[in-house]
């Protein structure tokens, strides 16, 4: 005989809907939403809807774990396996926070040092290329231009003319 029973009854948001199961003496754990996309208030990000990356890292500020995987920008925020896994595994934690939190996205699953090395190598190999045409492995052009814009780096600048300050902002 089983000592535990798991009933995955998605779409039953009210505890009263579990009365039949509770009448059997089974303890009901309050359900919380899971497997949802993240709405992002940063409207400039919405301009990137449709942009996808293969191996992003998603981290909720204050939550101990981060999750990697494909990520896509939508009209309202971000979605994809990395986001859905984060929302599933942090579901109770997010519920306690009333679903308001800051999410950090590393668009490529590389350390800061690895990113610096890759960008330096790209600059050394292509000093005459405009920085907007340089990019990073795994970063779509529209996303790269967005990153440059957020770093206030002119997209028409030749990569060899990038100042240390501009490099660090990227």
Which sequence ranges carry the predicted segments?
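Mid-to-C-terminal "cap/lid" subdomains and adjacent gly/pro-rich loops that border
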Residues: 22, 27-85, 90
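Short hydrophobic core segments
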Residues: 1-12, 20-22, 71-76
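Rossmann-like NAD(P)(H) cofactor-binding subdomain of soluble oxidoreductases
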Residues: 17
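Residue-level recognition of phosphate/Mg2+-coordinating polar/acidic sites
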Residues: 7-8, 59-170
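Surface-exposed, flexible loop/turn segments at secondary-structure boundaries
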Residues: 13-14, 36
């Amino acid at each position: 005989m089983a000592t535990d029973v798991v009933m995955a009854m998605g779409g039953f948001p009210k505890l009263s809907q579990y009365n039949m199961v509770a009448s059997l003496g089974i303890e009901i754990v309050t359900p919380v939403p899971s497997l949802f996309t993240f709405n992002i208030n940063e409207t400039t990000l919405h301009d990137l809807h449709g942009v996808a990356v293969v191996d992003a890292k998603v981290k909720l500020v204050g939550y101990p774990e981060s999750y990697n995987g494909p990520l896509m920008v939508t009209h309202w925020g971000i979605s994809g396996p990395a986001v859905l896994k984060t929302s599933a595994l942090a579901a109770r934690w997010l519920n306690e926070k009333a679903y308001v939190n800051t999410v950090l996205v590393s668009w490529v699953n590389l350390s800061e040092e690895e990113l610096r090395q890759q960008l330096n190598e790209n600059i050394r190999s292509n000093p005459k290329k405009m920085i907007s045409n340089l990019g990073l492995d795994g970063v779509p052009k529209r996303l790269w231009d967005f990153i440059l814009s957020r770093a206030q780096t002119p997209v028409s600048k030749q990569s060899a003319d990038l100042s240390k300050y501009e490099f660090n902002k990227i």
